[in-house]
Amino acid sequence: MKVIFLKDVKGKGKKGEIKNVPDGYANNFLLKQGLAAEATNSSMKTLDAQKRKEEKDAAAEVENAKELKETLEKLTVEVKAKSGEGGRLFGSITSKQIVDVMQKSHKIKLDKRKFEMDDAIRALGYTNVNVKLHPQVTATVKVHVSEQ
């Protein structure tokens, strides 16, 4: 029997795959558990439409990430902090503080976990920080730390 897998089934198939499986296995397990649906013409058309919609959504998501990347790379985030001798900061600048400043001054809301910082910023001056907007899109934000 030809079935369309609705969920991943270990050793049999992944979600969205169309495979031939034994009739008994399909009727008694896959269909009853809701793991698969019988592959009819209408269900195949529905699956194709769903796949096209997912591809379109993924392409739109990448496009939005690229637009945001262009915006982020044009701006400089100004962060003020107290510093001591030699430009060393009292404390450090974390991704959370950068996100807060971006929210207030540029009205751009990002998740702090998207910032790829090896370590917090501990000195005055300019620093480039990578932001992972999408698995395929990474932007670089210029952060300027100045004295308060």
Swiss-Prot record:
Swiss-Prot/TrEMBL keywords: Ribonucleoprotein, Ribosomal protein, RNA-binding, rRNA-binding
Domain of life: Bacteria
Cellular component aspect of the GO annotation: ribonucleoprotein complex; ribosome
Alphabetical list of InterPro entries matching this protein: Ribosomal_bL9, Ribosomal_bL9/RNase_H1_N, Ribosomal_bL9_bac/chp, Ribosomal_bL9_C, Ribosomal_bL9_C_sf, Ribosomal_bL9_N, Ribosomal_bL9_N_sf
GO annotation terms (biological process): translation
Function: Binds to the 23S rRNA.
The name this protein goes by in its record: Large ribosomal subunit protein bL9
Species of origin: Bacillus mycoides (strain KBAB4) (Bacillus weihenstephanensis)
